[in-house]
């Protein structure tokens, strides 16, 4: 089964839907794509292989799907915030977001990776800094 180490609850709600740190839907998508590309390059430099990006499945979206050198599937949520206000980038992955990511990941895993272990990571960009949180949450967290 897909698993990861337990993590403390991130507290707070998902990021606001309207306005937010990066206003404008088109601009938000472009900004998001830029951060996802930077996260992908960062992870590839650390030995993970790219599998897929922006996979929409079962009502959720997987920002990045990577594969570790040991064959483990790594589902990566990419978040960006200009500052740590309201808890910052990592804390913005609230239980609702985790639930959507987990549902999509488990469906992807069943179709493409059953038999392989998997984990859920977060790459958080905040005030120009990148943090890679391995095993950020578990499939049974949400």
Curated annotation (Swiss-Prot):
Transmembrane segments: none annotated. Disulfide bonds: none annotated. One of its GO terms (molecular function) is nucleic acid binding. Gene3D superfamilies: 3.40.1350.10. NCBIfam families: PRK12497.1-3, YraN family protein. Belongs to the UPF0102 family. This is UPF0102 protein Bcep1808_0248. The lineage of its organism: Bacteria, Pseudomonadati, Pseudomonadota, Betaproteobacteria, Burkholderiales.
